[in-house]
């Protein structure tokens, strides 16, 4: 009898130890986020922004609570980025440099790093399964509940939850950015990248020169798309960026999935009227208001940028009519 009970207990424990299947789109998105930060893996993929297509190799290792990664461009001039403990080094046909950042954000779908539980105003939809790169993937759509943000379609590996493919779409379902895996490998053999990265001398760390507000900015946004919140603001002398005098003011906003920055600077005599440019998911919109130029750079549609500019409010001291 004791043997029988022990067998039942053992069976119960083994069943409880089996990972429960994911049941909701949010489960898949959360698992994807964790997988990309904690698995040891390599992905060969194509990354398209507008008409520009690049082939790349991304290697990632997680060791002793730290992430190590290498992103290598496989075409034309060799260019690579190295991640080591919240610092990314850039190497290519330019002066090497490093930036303080926890992720490699260039030519890689930043959607994998989002905290999906904190997103506001999006619907997560399950679109079934599909085969990608000889893997079975779960198709998840991230759809905004308005027309002022972009949407994502994601193909997530059913076994290890790595992202295999993604489409960033505008309101008309045009693909603005595409990530498509050709080959995906997961395993502890990728830990071999840790030691070379740990011993690598990274280039000089560039310090950002945007200063926190020396005085309150004399303007504010009365409207932003749903879910966006200001995460930073500051002032910078143009002489630090360009051979010009004057100051540029900025406010950075994010909803946890997309971001944009609004810049305000003194007009130099050339008026900008509803000028818009876009490459992939990044848009640039400029408008002159009085003697000020307003420039918006970020991952939002033209309709959103226009609405934001229309709702800028200046204080009485800084009003530009």
What are these regions (language model features)?
Residues 133-199:
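Gly/Pro-enriched, hydrophobic low-complexity segments
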Residues 103-152:
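Intrinsically disordered, low-complexity linker/loop segments enriched in Gly/Pro
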Residues 2, 15-66, 76, 129, ...:
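N-terminal leader/targeting segments and the immediate start of mature chains
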Residues 201-289, 303:
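Short, solvent-exposed recognition patches
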Residues 53-57, 148-152, 164, 176-178, ...:
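Short, surface-exposed coil-to-beta transition loops
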Residues 55-109, 168-180:
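An acidic-aromatic
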Residues 6-15:
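Bacterial N-terminal signal peptides
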């Amino acid at each position: 009898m004791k043997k029988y009970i022990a067998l039942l207990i053992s069976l119960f424990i083994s069943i409880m130890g089996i990972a429960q299947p994911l049941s909701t789109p949010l489960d898949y998105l959360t698992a994807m986020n964790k997988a990309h930060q904690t698995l040891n893996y390599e992905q060969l993929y194509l990354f398209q922004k507008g008409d520009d297509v690049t082939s790349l190799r991304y290697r990632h290792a997680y060791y002793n609570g730290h992430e190590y990664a290498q992103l290598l461009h496989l075409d034309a001039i060799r260019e690579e980025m190295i991640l080591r403990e919240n610092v990314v080094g850039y190497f290519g046909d330019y002066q090497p440099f490093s930036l303080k950042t926890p992720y490699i954000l260039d030519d890689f779908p930043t959607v994998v790093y989002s905290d999906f539980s904190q997103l506001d105003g999006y619907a997560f939809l399950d679109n079934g399964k599909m085969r990608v790169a000889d893997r079975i993937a779960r198709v998840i759509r991230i759809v905004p509940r308005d027309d002022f943000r972009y949407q994502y379609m994601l193909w997530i590996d059913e076994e290890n939850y790595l992202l295999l493919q993604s489409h960033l779409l505008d309101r008309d379902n045009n693909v603005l950015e595409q990530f498509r895996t050709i080959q995906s490998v997961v395993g502890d053999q990728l830990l071999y990248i840790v030691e070379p990265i740990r011993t690598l001398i990274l280039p000089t760390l560039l310090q950002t020169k945007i200063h926190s507000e020396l005085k309150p900015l004399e303007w504010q946004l009365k409207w932003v798309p749903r879910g966006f919140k200001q995460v930073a603001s500051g002032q910078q002398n143009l002489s630090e960026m360009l051979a010009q005098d004057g100051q540029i003011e900025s406010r950075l906003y994010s909803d946890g999935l997309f971001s944009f920055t609004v810049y305000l600077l003194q007009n130099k005599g050339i008026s900008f009227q509803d000028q818009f440019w876009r490459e992939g998911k990044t848009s640039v919109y400029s408008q002159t208001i009085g003697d000020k130029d307003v420039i918006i750079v970020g991952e939002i549609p033209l309709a959103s940028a226009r609405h934001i500019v229309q709702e800028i409010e200046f204080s009485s001291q800084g009003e530009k009519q």
